[in-house]
């Protein structure tokens, strides 16, 4: 009898070990699949051999570039040292992508490793927290994941310790959360740690919810998107956010991570796109009242990426025709969903015809009208004070902002003095009265100036 019990126990132990091994193999399979998909997405980029040749020639033996300042701590949006990582990204893509002369180049590999090693040792500082938490890690993670399997695991783990999982920081919300979560996902892939990948994916999925309180950052019930207090940011942060969500929906499709994006979350995201972003743009242009300080950037008016809509055609097949029509509209076809909508959480009204766009933006005590941060949008004070956006071609405001009279923004009533448009920090509304009504076809918007 004792012998039978011993045999039974040994059998149970063997079964447990076998099951554990299968779970481990499945986990590694998922890690490899996710890693492969991420790498494949980076290798879609084109390689400019002349650019790579320039970087390879310039890189010094210690892994630094002679034209970059790694020492000076800059404030705001200036971070010259960050170009180091962007160059390494391009070099790593060239190394991994077949069909160019740098593919599998041993010399280029050594240079990329030297560049990563230099950054790991020196760790250039910035006066802007964003570069430390998000900007630099986002660029650093790409060459590192592209070198997985090309350098020793020991080296890979050593360099990946630079990447930190910051998803536990509750201060990272909306777009900032998807940024830090992407770093965690890459770290998990690099280190063969499926738990980190789960944490990152779950963190991204957690942003797909309605945030009801005014001041909470993220998706609003009216289809608008807020970032930086109760501020309309469907463009800028919001456009980058929807790019991220559509990308990760595609990335996890058919994997163990797909269930984190429940149907409820997908429905919320689809409403954000169809009932929000689609209505705030016209052809290739996004409403300048919904892009915050991005109005000061060269590509600030860019509308949603066609690639994002292509991802959604595959992940929301019931509305594939709607995404296709939207994509055609970006290239000049008639707008597919004409009408009027008032975004009551964001104090903006839009009116669409098949061949025109009109919007008016106001402010109230419930909203933060716009912002000046990092020396961007220095003259944006009047932007939420009745500004009217009128588009028929979609190119009316292309390149105009550097020479605009910011005291005469269409639709506004402003003091005609050079300093009256100057903005410092956030612009908070002081008027309680402000809002609009809409029946879906026509609407009225007003506010107390």
Regions found by a protein language model. Give the residues of each.
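Intrinsic-disorder-associated interaction segments
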Residues: 23-32, 44-48, 80, 105-108, ...
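Bacterial Sec-dependent N-terminal signal peptides
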Residues: 1-23
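Mature N-terminal, pre-catalytic/accessory segment of carbohydrate-active enzymes
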Residues: 20-80
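Alpha-helix initiation and N-capping motif
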Residues: 52, 156, 319-323
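Aromatic-lined, polymer-binding surfaces characteristic
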Residues: 53-287, 292
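Extended polysaccharide-engagement surfaces of secreted carbohydrate-active enzymes
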Residues: 248-449
């Amino acid at each position: 009898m004792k012998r039978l019990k011993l045999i039974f126990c040994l059998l149970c132990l063997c079964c447990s070990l076998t099951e554990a091994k299968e779970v481990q193999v499945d986990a590694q399979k998922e890690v490899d699949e996710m890693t492969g998909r991420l790498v494949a997405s980076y290798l879609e980029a084109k390689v400019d051999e002349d650019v790579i040749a320039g970087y390879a020639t310039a890189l010094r033996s210690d892994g630094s570039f002679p034209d970059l300042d790694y020492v000076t701590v800059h404030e705001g949006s200036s971070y010259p040292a960050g170009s180091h990582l962007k160059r390494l990204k391009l070099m790593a893509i060239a190394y991994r992508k077949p069909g160019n002369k740098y593919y599998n180049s041993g010399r280029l590999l050594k240079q990329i490793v030297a560049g990563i090693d230099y950054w790991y040792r020196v760790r250039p500082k910035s006066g802007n927290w964003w570069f430390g938490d998000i900007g630099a890690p986002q660029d650093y993670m790409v060459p590192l994941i592209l070198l997985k399997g090309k350098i020793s695991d020991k080296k890979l783990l050593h360099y990946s310790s630079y990447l930190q999982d910051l998803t536990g920081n509750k201060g990272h919300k909306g777009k900032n959360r998807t940024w830090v979560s992407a770093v965690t996902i890459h770290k998990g892939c690099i280190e063969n740690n499926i738990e980190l990948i789960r944490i990152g994916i779950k963190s991204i999925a957690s942003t797909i919810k309605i945030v009801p309180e005014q001041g909470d950052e993220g998706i609003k019930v009216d289809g608008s998107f807020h970032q930086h207090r109760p501020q309309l940011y469907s463009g800028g942060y919001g456009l980058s956010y929807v790019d991220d969500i559509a990308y990760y929906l595609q990335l996890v499709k058919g994997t163990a991570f797909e269930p984190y994006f429940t149907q409820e979350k997908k429905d919320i995201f689809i409403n954000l796109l169809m009932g929000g972003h689609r209505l705030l743009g016209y052809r290739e242009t996004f409403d300048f009242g919904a892009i915050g300080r991005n109005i000061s950037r060269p590509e600030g008016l860019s509308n949603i990426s066609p690639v994002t809509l292509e991802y959604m055609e595959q992940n929301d097949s019931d509305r594939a025709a709607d995404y296709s029509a939207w994509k055609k509209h970006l290239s000049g076809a008639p707008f597919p969903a004409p009408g009027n909508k008032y975004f009551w959480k964001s104090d903006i009204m839009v009116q669409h015809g098949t061949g025109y766009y009109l919007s008016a933006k106001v402010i109230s005590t419930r909203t933060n009208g716009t912002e000046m941060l990092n020396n961007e949008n220095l003259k944006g004070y009047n932007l939420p004070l009745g500004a009217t956006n009128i588009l028929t071609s979609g190119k009316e405001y292309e390149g105009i902002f550097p020479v605009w009279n910011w005291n005469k923004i269409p639709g506004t009533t402003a003091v005609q003095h050079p300093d009256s448009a100057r903005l410092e920090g956030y612009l908070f509304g002081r008027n309680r009265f402000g809002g609009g009504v809409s029946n879906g076809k026509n609407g009225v918007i007003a506010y107390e100036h």
